[in-house]
Each structure stands twice: as structure tokens, then as C-alpha cells.
Swiss-Prot record:
It is found in: Cell outer membrane. Its main location: membrane. It comes from Taylorella asinigenitalis (strain MCE3). Part of the outer membrane protein assembly complex, which is involved in assembly and insertion of beta-barrel proteins into the outer membrane. A lipid is attached at residue 22 (N-palmitoyl cysteine). This is Outer membrane protein assembly factor BamB. It is a lipid-anchor. It comes from the Bacteria. Keywords: Cell outer membrane, Lipoprotein, Membrane, Palmitate, Signal. Pfam families: PQQ_2 (PF13360). Transmembrane segments: none annotated.
Length: 384
């Protein structure tokens, strides 16, 4: 039986409940979210603009910044293009279906997927539907588009490439399904006519966009125990891709960086760090938010830890992002926590206007940080 894990740390909680029933855990309170103490706020986080776009968010929904616009979607079928300067809605399209992921933006298209296992391509300028096509099964990973292809990774881990012009299937790539997998904010990346995508059991592959053949493959994490839950080692978040290397994070695994030369990968460093949300990056520093709520900064060159903070233990953190020397991370109570990137000190805290947890990944832009909160509000914030 295939089981998909739907919350960031549901695997940990499920394991705790199981063992707790067997009286092996006596201190289940260790999984309770940390209570927040007052902090001395040395910065002020302001809302530049906000607009209501639909019905909240989910793990498969990630806003995208392109052409001075924010593109986003919500589970109720709403897809929008918003002016990044002022939050005005350029267009809003309501599809007659329930969506499972979005958005992918590229080749003049905005791509979403639905519960009927279909992908929809909308015109990025007008919001009008261009084409739709059937998938192997539903997809809860945001699609990606570019170089004449639309790429979808379905929940059976099949990667499919469709023609951007008409939605015709070009190729399909699949690996054996694991018993358990983590349903979280994993995303793909496009570079040099290749798509980089996570596949089961802690692996990341680069596939040629022309025919789906494997350019290279890395193993970011390995199973560490005998149980099915121990075997969950999925690569999470969006891989950090550089001209000569790639860095990944994984659940029950590591942050791992590789150098790439002539399609050959050489491990540079790895650091044990279990995450469900992926990495942030700025100025040769990698930032991570772990499954237990640790926020840490690592040197890109060698993985040395610059600083680490455990103030936000078990608070269901989002991916960390950087804007103008501050690190932003969201939590399960709809709060944004702001760190000084140099010292690792918490310098600010901000409510996004909803007590629901922030599930969609934070999006850094050159204008601030975009947040899609749990109540369907899209907003741009920044610290002053």
C-alpha cells in the first residue's frame, strides 16, 4: 500500500503515536511547538501590498515571480497574475475544477494541475486557457515550463514532458515507487536544456529535455532503519543550482553539495540535517530550516556552520528566504520570523493576517518577500 504523508512532520508524529501506544515514548511533549518568548524587535516588517486570490494554499502551490508579476493559484481553481509593484490583479481565471498544484511559468504559459489528473496551460498575458492534457495520475508538485517543454512530476513519480505549444506528450520517465513518500514543497529546476527533479529514496536526477534520458544522478540520503518510516528520505524543496554545482536537502538525510564538470558529479560536502522545506541561499551562504525547527546557516564552500538557532522548535517552518540581509521563515501560526543573516539573531516577528499555517513556500523577489497565507491572501512584505 502506498501512503503519502501530507504534513511537514507527519511522519515524525505518526511514528511517535505508534511507539507511544507501545509505551516506548514517555515524553510526547517534546513534539509540542515551542512557545514564543518576546523578542527585542530591531526592525519593522511592513506589508507593501496584499490581495485576496482564492481559497488558501497547500503543499503543491508555490507562487512564481516573472515579468514583474506574481503568478499564483489556489485549490478552488483560481489562477492569478498580480502586479509585483502594487498588488493589482492583472487577470484572474477561475477554472471549473479543483487544483492540486501550481504554478509553473515559462514559454508564455502558466501551468496548473487538478484532481482529475489533468494539466492546464493558460496564456500568461491574458489568463485564457491554451490547452489541457491528461497526466499519468494527479500531481501535487508545481509544474515547470521552459525551453519549449512543460514538465510535470506526478504523484506516481512519473516525470512527463509536454510540448509548450499544444500539450503533446514528448517523453516519460519513471522510477519504482517507494512504500512511503513525503508530500511537501518539492520543486523542479530548469538549467542548460535539462530538468532537475527529485525521485524516490533520496535521489535527484537531471533529465535531458529533448528525450528524457538521464544526464546525471545523485543520492542525497539513504534509509537509516528497518521500518517503512525510516525509508522516507525524499529530496525536498527546490534544488540550488549553480553554474558548476548543485546543493540539495532531504528529509531524514543531509544538506549535500556537489560540483559538476562534464556531467560528472563530485561530492564537496554534506551535513546531517533533516528538512521538509528545502534551502535558501544568499552571498555564498546556504540557509536551512529543519524538521524539528532548527534554523541554520552553512558556508557554501565547505558546509561549515556559521550559526544555528533553536528558538522555533516544532513550529512547522517554511523554507527560509533572504531579502536585503534578513532571513525570513514562516510557521504554523501564520507568523514570519526574521533573522539577521550575519549574527543569526531574531530581530523581528510579523503576522500575515491568518492563524492558519503557511504551507506555500515563501518567495524572495527584488521587491521583498511574497507570502501566500493559509486563507488565500497573497502579500508582499519587507523589513525596514
Amino acid at each position: 500500500m502506498k501512503l503519502t504523508l501530507k504534513r511537514k512532520f507527519i511522519a515524525v508524529l505518526a511514528l511517535t503515536s505508534l511507539l507511544g501506544a507501545c509505551s516506548l515514548f514517555k515524553n510526547e511533549r517534546r513534539f509540542e511547538p515551542a512557545k514564543l518568548a518576546d523578542i527585542k524587535q530591531s526592525i519593522v516588517v511592513n506589508t507593501v501590498w496584499q490581495t485576496s486570490i482564492g481559497s488558501g494554499g497547500s503543499a503543491g502551490f508555490a507562487p512564481v515571480y516573472a515579468d514583474n508579476s506574481i503568478f499564483a493559484a489556489t485549490p478552488d481553481g483560481t489562477v492569478v497574475r498580480v502586479n509585483a509593484e502594487n498588488g493589482n490583479i492583472a487577470w484572474s481565471t477561475k477554472l471549473d475544477t479543483k487544483l492540486t498544484s501550481g504554478v509553473g511559468v515559462g514559454d508564455g504559459l502558466v501551468i496548473v494541475t487538478d484532481r482529475k489528473a489533468k494539466a492546464y496551460a493558460l496564456n500568461a498575458q491574458t489568463g485564457e486557457k491554451v490547452w489541457d492534457t491528461e497526466l499519468s495520475t494527479i500531481s501535487t508538485m508545481p509544474p515547470i515550463a521552459g525551453f519549449g517543454k512543460v514538465i510535470v512530476r506526478a504523484d506516481d513519480f512519473r516525470v512527463q514532458a509536454f510540448d509548450s505549444k499544444d500539450g503533446k506528450l514528448h517523453w516519460s520517465f519513471v522510477r519504482t515507487n517507494p512504500i512511503l513518500s513525503l508530500k511537501t514543497n518539492s520543486r523542479m529546476a530548469l538549467i542548460n536544456n535539462a530538468v532537475i527533479v527529485a525521485v524516490p529514496t533520496g535521489k535527484l536526477v537531471s533529465l535531458n529535455l529533448n528525450d528524457g534520458t538521464v544526464n546525471w544522478e545523485i543520492h542525497s540520503a539513504s534509509a537509516k532503519g528497518p521500518s517503512d518510516i525510516d525509508s522516507v528520505t525524499d529530496v525536498v524543496g527546490q534544488p540550488l543550482v549553480f553554474n558548476d554545482g548543485v546543493c540539495t536537502s532531504s528529509y531524514q538525510g543531509n544538506i549535500t553539495c556537489y560540483s559538476i564538470k562534464n556531467s560528472r558529479l563530485t561530492p564537496v560536502w554534506f551535513e546531517p540535517f533533516s528538512s521538509a522545506v528545502g534551502l535558501g541561499y544568499d552571498n555564498n551562504i546556504i540557509y536551512g530550516a529543519s524538521i524539528d525547527g532548527t534554523v541554520a546557516a552553512f558556508s557554501l564552500a565547505n558546509g561549515q556552520i556559521a550559526w544555528s538557532d533553536q528558538t522555533l522548535i516544532n513550529r512547522g517552518l517554511t523554507n527560509p528566504v533572504v531579502y536585503q540581509n534578513y532571513l525570513y521563515v514562516g510557521d504554523l501560526d501564520g507568523l514570519i520570523h526574521v533573522y539577521d543573516t550575519k549574527s543569526g539573531s531574531l530581530v523581528g516577528r510579523f503576522s500575515v493576517g491568518s492563524s492558519k499555517d503557511i504551507v506555500s513556500p515563501l518567495l524572495p523577489t527584488d521587491k521583498g518577500v511574497v507570502v501566500q497565507n493559509g486563507s488565500g491572501t497573497l502579500m508582499l512584505i519587507r523589513a525596514n
